[in-house]
């Protein structure tokens, strides 16, 4: 086989492989990405509440009553919030602990739970107790939710049997788009 003919066969094989790979990639369903993926946990945090108590020696502030937190496109609403911070130089918020009807909202999702922790250093939001994650008309119910703000990945666990309404299992309801059948 001549060198020229061998090169033509290699180019044709590569072209066919490329077309096959493209067709396979287009056939794969696109996974929805959370609006919280890549959330800037270094953005300023704004907190409003009915009452605040600052415990400077303990490097924490406690907010109570209609607490509303915003950071970029993320909002958190709750009844009570403890803000842990470090005060070496300037104040840097490390963690938010929320209790009492915690609701975390992004442009496309809403997550609810009894208690919540937002670890700004690890870029994780954890909700526990009667957890519900809603996106559009779809929702998932469980006992614990962890949202990784780096990847946008959300993991929901069911918890021990008999503890949660879902009987220890995760329960989901997903809407299906009309396919014009």
Per-range role (PLM):
Residues 1-181:
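Mature-chain termini and adjacent capping regions
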